[in-house]
């Protein structure tokens, strides 16, 4: 199969195989978005007189048939075809003859893959947003459920001050609310139309870029055609930072869960069917889900650096280096969603231990409570600190285990309603409905 850039000269199969690499495999993830981009592009071409009305009707019908093939998992990129763009054009040409060759007017594979990646990223980010919200809801539910169950708080892995499961679950809920800000920023960058930038320098055709922006439900466009091409690599890196931010939260939570589940802590218990065993030690119940989540999320945190190293120090314009970014960027969404889903499942099924702080080994954790009590009675804080410290050293410290924390965000005043409000406000800023309406209009038969 000759490439679409064929000039009548022999193609070196070795070079072809090396330069195509895994692109065909990665492009299968982009197939439906490539067809959507083509639907918008041909609608625009007809509006400026580069296609006849009947040609638009015929091409649109065939492109929508291709969408059906993709949805049914019956679409393939044939052997010898370089990429999804070439496959779509080939199938249209087979069906409609020379009419199929007209769809590339005013377009390059450079802006074609850009719009594919923007649409793909926008869609996949939506999936991550929904998964994060589902995990957030579980964390808030568990925080409210166990708000009165106390837990040791640690600094330097030394027992420090009283905490609670309400605080622990709620802390990660609020962390996800902040992480959602990064996802919102990443979504906004992916929601700008690059189509019409062609190879990176525009076109002499009178392209109507606002029309394709509207048809694809983009919020705006990358106006400068050179910059539109410069977003390749930059978009992926910035989105990767957003994914890595969520991954960092999950990794930290996973470490806590592994530690709290161990016999030396015993703060939480996982159901037997959520653990794995040992081939030699019959007593083992290992938290492998959290361990694998920690490793996968640490791997995801390296993604921005990996993309940076592939794209750093490139001048403006397109370079083939960008092709390799797809291989690490595209799979990252499913990896993160898998981690979020598994963490949510585990947290829904854990059991927390009651009365942890009744154990005498945690008596010193109430030392600050005693210092504060003395300070409230008029003893200077530093003197109260010394008195309590001395009683701990000489073994005479008797803790008062009543907790009275009432300020915002403390054990007795979790402010979960405010955290929920923060999350809901951020979620309102995602224009999902507007996008759905545009895509449904574009793709409906």
Segments (PLM) and residue ranges:
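Short linear loop/turn motifs
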Residues: 58-61, 226-231, 387-391
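Generic, well-ordered alpha-helical scaffold segments in large soluble proteins
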Residues: 41, 62, 66-69, 91, ...
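Charged, flexible cofactor/metal-binding loops and thiol motifs
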Residues: 118-125, 129-130, 144, 152, ...
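Short, well-ordered beta-strand elements within core beta-sheets of diverse protein domains
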Residues: 43-51, 167, 237-245, 369-377
